[in-house]
């Protein structure tokens, strides 16, 4: 039987219910990977005019449809529109280093700058959405990542120590900005986006990037504002965050997230995430990106098949995918073998139904 995309499958995952069949999910997939899979050139069209953007999203949505996703992952990030941005990448300080910088920063213009770029892209996405599918994502970047881009990671620590009131005001303003943009987003695109999310990397391989106390004091109160807004609009919320963040997981779950994505085997096996949190939230991912990059293609589908069946049996709401994303450096054959592993799991489950 031909595969039928059905966004309701992903709603089951976000409700932490076992879906009728295994879904696949990715946070981000490089359009350069999509070009190789589809044998079409379109990645650069996203920055063009209306006709170019329409063609980009036609191909973009076709990729998700043909790769058997049930939702189309898409976001427009906040940091790309911030004047003076780039500190999050390292090597430079952000535009806000003191109270005077905070006061003169053009906060009242940021929402306008965001929508000048984002609106056309969201509209083109919606116009090209395949039947049976809905979008997943929305306004990209979380509270901590925006603070890193505005100040710089190291300088955030100095600011917190030297002027904690300034730190608190910075995070309040970031929260205000996110609420302002998300409010407009939900007014315009709630019908098209069935699941909302943002990504905010709070950790690395051995711990959180800043102390759990700092995260609880400055970051999570602003999370709550956005999550409450999303949930108030009747949308489930998916949180993406990399790193060893076990110290704050219970705090984030208490805010009302419905599911979490991102894992790395060097930090903890995915089975551990299921054991700790699978009774409370949906969990997405499970396939370490290193596996896709390092293993031979013939080995990947077999390993994905074995792991995916195990994760699906142990978790309630589960969607298979990479533990992070599919950047341009992932071998396209490795990615396709992961999708093949998911297809084989579905096929095996259908066979089991017929036998039983």
Question: What are the roles of these predicted feature ranges?
Answer:
Residues 1-53, 59, 70-74, 93-94, ...:
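Active-site loop segments of alpha/beta catalytic cores
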Residues 32, 80-86, 330:
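Detector for C-terminal structural segments
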């Amino acid at each position: 039987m031909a595969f039928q995309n059905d966004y309701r499958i992903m709603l089951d995952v976000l409700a932490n219910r076992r879906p009728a069949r295994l879904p696949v999910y990715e946070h981000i997939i490089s359009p350069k990977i999509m070009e190789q899979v589809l044998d079409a050139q379109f990645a650069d069209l996203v920055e063009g005019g209306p006709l170019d953007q329409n063609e980009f999203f036609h191909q973009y949505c076709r990729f998700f449809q043909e790769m058997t996703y049930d939702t189309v992952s898409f976001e427009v990030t906040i940091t790309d529109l911030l004047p003076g941005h780039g500190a999050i990448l390292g090597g430079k300080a952000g535009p806000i280093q003191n109270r005077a910088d905070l006061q003169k920063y053009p906060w009242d213009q940021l929402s306008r700058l965001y929508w000048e770029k984002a609106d056309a892209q969201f509209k083109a996405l919606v116009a090209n959405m395949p039947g049976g599918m809905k979008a997943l994502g929305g306004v990209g970047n979380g509270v901590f990542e925006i603070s890193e881009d505005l100040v710089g990671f190291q300088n955030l620590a100095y600011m917190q120590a030297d002027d904690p009131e300034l730190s608190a005001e910075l995070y309040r303003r970031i929260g205000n900005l996110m609420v302002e943009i998300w409010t407009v987003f939900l007014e315009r695109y709630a019908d098209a986006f069935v699941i909302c999310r943002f990504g905010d990397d709070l950790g690395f391989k051995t711990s959180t990037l800043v102390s759990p106390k700092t995260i609880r004091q400055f970051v999570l109160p602003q999370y709550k504002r956005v999550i409450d807004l999303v949930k108030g609009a009747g949308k489930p919320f998916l949180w993406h965050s990399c790193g060893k963040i076990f110290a704050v997981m219970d705090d984030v779950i208490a805010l009302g997230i419905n599911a979490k994505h991102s894992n790395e085997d060097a930090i903890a096996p995915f089975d551990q995430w299921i054991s700790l949190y699978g009774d409370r939230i949906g969990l997405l991912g499970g396939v370490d990106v290193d596996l896709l990059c390092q293993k031979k293609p013939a080995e990947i589908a077999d390993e994905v098949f074995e792991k995916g069946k195990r994760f699906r049996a142990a978790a309630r709401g589960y969607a298979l995918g990479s533990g992070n994303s599919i950047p341009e450096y992932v071998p396209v054959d490795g990615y396709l073998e992961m999708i093949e592993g998911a297809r084989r799991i579905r096929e095996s489950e259908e066979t089991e139904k017929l036998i039983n």
